[in-house]
Amino acid sequence: MVIIINKITIGRGQVVKGDVFIFPKGETLNVEDLYGFIQYQDELYRRKYEPNYDMYVSNHPILRAPLKAWSENNKLVVPMPRLLVDEYAGYFGGNAPTVQLEDETDNDSLQVWLNDSEFADEHSEIVKAVGIYGRSYLLAYQGEDSKPKIAHVEPDEGFMIYDDTIKSEPLAFVRYSRDYLNHVTGTIYYAGFSVDFKDDKLEEPVNYVWHEVPAVEFYSNEERQGIFDGVKTLIEALDKALSKKADQVDYFDNAYLLALGLNLEDENGRIHIDREQRFIYSPDADATHAKVEFIGKPDADGMQENLINRLIDLIYYTSMIPNLQDSAFSGNSSGVALQFKLLPMQNMAAFQERKFIKSLRRMFKVLFESADGGQIVRAINKDSWLDLRFTYTRNMPQNMADAVSTAVQASSILSQQTALAMIPGIDDPQAELERKEDEQSNSMKKAMNQALPDYLKAGVDNDEENSEE
């Protein structure tokens, strides 16, 4: 059941769980509908995307807190959001997924296109953006050479609109920007055509090669939450606790010296307080009880240390990212023991992998079935997106000997191509098999040539030269 969590105040659009936009199927957007979505998107930017980006680049809220008069004002930032996102993005997307087809000719063409379109880099940027914002997009377009290209679009630059059916199919993708005068320009991408717009004016539709909406949304969970969305308050509390800790250190460094019972009044009889030299004195009639000492307050160092350590542990625990600096990852722990420590992050990556494969398959469907899809695979095989195999390999330290041994054992019950895919560093198992076959063929020819009598070797060599010519 689709639950409407917000009705956009302008136009016919609605918002469901995860800040997902929906619109009546078969309809196109008018100006009112478009700006209803853009206004909600702007609010989403202010409420989520901008704060998340600020925290990722270490511009935390504590830096904007007002200064306190006559007090220490340390504002320390612990870059936990960047640490969590980069650690997980490297683990999940540090190794680009392999994309393969069974047909050798089409697979070779596909690998060339993947390299030419810099798919690995685009994929890594999507993984990072999903970690920060909770979602990201991949947009297909035609380059200047009329060849299909792809580019990632961050959620503060565009948004997807789905239809209101139970399957929630993509209905339109909007990419837009604002200039320094706050004028809005952009493009609405539909299936079969696009519409440019500027401010409150929609241009005439322009047909293009894409038979479906040429954009796909990537996300790791239906709620569209980023890696550190659930631990923001803990991170802010950590910044505050560490800053207070630094304030306390400064306090003891800058403690006031108190002098009692000494007649050090100025000529006007005023009690002198020197805030620059941090010195306070007060005369006392009984000079025999004069006292000079530093003013201090109770030391809460142990309590602060416990709070800081507890916050750090909670941030790692609730974000399901392991603390690689923890003592649990040192020593000679077995591979199985380390796998258990990584289990929460592995589970999260497994969920995200399924979501990403679903989105990637949809994108290749758009590419293969387009009017110029024959530039990637043969047009007759435009349905081959159904046969695509996506393989994700987690980026983590590997025991190559164990990996090779596992692949060898697996080859007895699996295909050689599947077994090779288990070995880290092999991005294209099919190409590796072809190279292996070529090596075996060349080795066999050399062995046969060496086994022949000398008077026959020359003839074989001549035959090989003639065949090459």
Please annotate each region the language model reported.
Residues 8-9, 204-337:
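Extended, charged amphipathic alpha-helical segments
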Residues 1-149, 464-469:
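Extended, helix-rich architectural segments
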Residues 1-15, 239-246, 250, 256-261, ...:
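Glycine- and charge-rich intrinsically disordered segments
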Residues 106, 114-122, 130, 230, ...:
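Short amphipathic alpha-helical segments
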Residues 127, 131-132, 137-224:
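Extended, regular secondary-structure scaffolds
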Residues 283-285, 310-324, 328-469:
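C-terminal helix-loop subdomains that flank or include functional centers
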Residues 30-34, 56, 63, 304-306, ...:
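Extended hydrophobic-aromatic, low-complexity segments
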Residues 113, 128, 294-305, 346-353, ...:
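Short, charged/polar micro-motifs that form catalytic or ligand-binding hotspots
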